[in-house]
Amino acid sequence: MCSLFLPGTHSRVIILQTMILFVGAGLGLAAPTEFRFDFGSGVQPRPGFVKVTPQQPYDASKGYGFLQSDTVPPVGILTNSNIAVAAVTPARATTGISTFAVDVPEGNYDVSIVFGNPTEPTSTTIKAESRRVMLQKVETKPGQFVTNSFTVNVRRPNLRGGGTIGLRNKDGQSEGSSLDWDDHLTLEFNGSHPGVDSLTVTPSTNAITLFIAGDSTVCDQPLEPWSGWGMILPSFFSQGVAVANHAQSGLALFSFEQQRRLKKILEEMHPGDYLFIQFGHNDQKDKSPGAGPYTSYKDNLKKYITAVREKGGIPVLVTSMERRNGKNWKDGKPEPTLADFATAARQVGEEEKVPVIDLNEMSVKFYTALGNEGSVKAFVHYPANTFPGQDKPLADDTHFNSYGAYELARCVAEGIKSKVPELAKKLLPDTGTFDPAHPDAPDSVQIPASLSVGANVKPAGS
């Protein structure tokens, strides 16, 4: 069994693979304040820090505590979540992963984390909300402590005029109880040898918010092994940019608006914020009279653009990546399935003077570089019994695993550099350059899996 804590003499204890949830009521947060946590046992916390022991379960009256650890079984909101521990077998439940909760309201937050261990090397990946990657592979040497910071968005489904967005319920899963829409900011501490020394959370009032509207290929997928590029994109930005990924599986431009998701974005948008728009997979299935890439699709894109500009925001179009289309390759690349929608988006970009990130074109280069057989490594293609409860093979040519999502996020980051130069200034210096015709090797991308596994729950859309 992995211990929750790494041994050491440093006054603040190191947490192993910890998922931290910030829940929304108990600390009386009518006005946001700074929260500082020091995880220790048998020692006094630093001045101004809250001491929490690993044996302390979440207590709503206190507003913080563990929802799950090696000594605290799953309780309360974690059990009721749609990623709840049904997939956590007894063998996986002793990994040292734990969940910690503390109250915060909706908004953007700057998160500062001190990494390190007095006697051992550490390697930590940070995820937020539904597996949103914030920091990748932060490494320290024995006795070394480093501080990394990022800005994260926390949202609620409530609309200002009353009511909520149109939350979905599918296969027994309630979107309203997902980590994207509940009362929590979720931070998952993962990696080969995680080491977190302390944590500070501060409301961020001046951050740029990068909103995303899209479908299952973009969204923060709550369950392994499914991934969207929008859940990887935050890891490429420096503190001061919060990615608010409102994309949802199964949606098209018209249904995203019908479910009041665009309205929610516009309510939260401030001048200078961005909305990245990627649809096409599900718009293609619209059989209503007059529907099509050069009619309703273009009209809906223009409607979004107008609404964003009225709020002082900056719209950016992203053409839909191609499906792998594994049974239909010609001349070494997949036959196109979304070419008309990509062309229509490019036309709208030119007509409306809106930046267009051509992910469709870049994705074809990416798949072609891997080859027909090799490209399965970017998608959810796995033999039976790869994941808990998965008794049948998975062969999905639409939805991506973490490697595929990571490579597409790199494509989007490259598109930002060429098409959205002001936002590109906020990319991390080590983002580097990326050519999809020369992608990273699949084995070189190591994003540790979360415990929230749902291999038998395919996202809506195709």
Stretches found by the model and what they are:
Residues D180-D182, N190-V196, T202-I212, T217-A307, ...:
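Conserved SGNH/GDSL esterase-like catalytic core that processes O-acyl groups on lipids
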Residues R36, V243-N245, K353-V356:
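Conserved beta-strand scaffold positions in the cores of enzyme catalytic domains, especially
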Residues R260-P429, A437, P448, V457-S462:
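Alpha-helical cap/lid subdomain in secreted, periplasmic
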Residues A128-S130, F237-Q239, K311, E352:
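Short, structured coil segments at secondary-structure junctions
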Residues V13-G26:
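Bacterial N-terminal signal peptides
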Residues M1-R12:
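N-terminal secretory signal peptides that target proteins for export/translocation
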Residues L29-L223, Q390:
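Compositionally biased, intrinsically disordered or flexible polar/acidic segments
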Residues P90, L251-F256, K333-P334:
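Short, flexible loop segments at the rims of nucleotide/cofactor-binding pockets, characterized by
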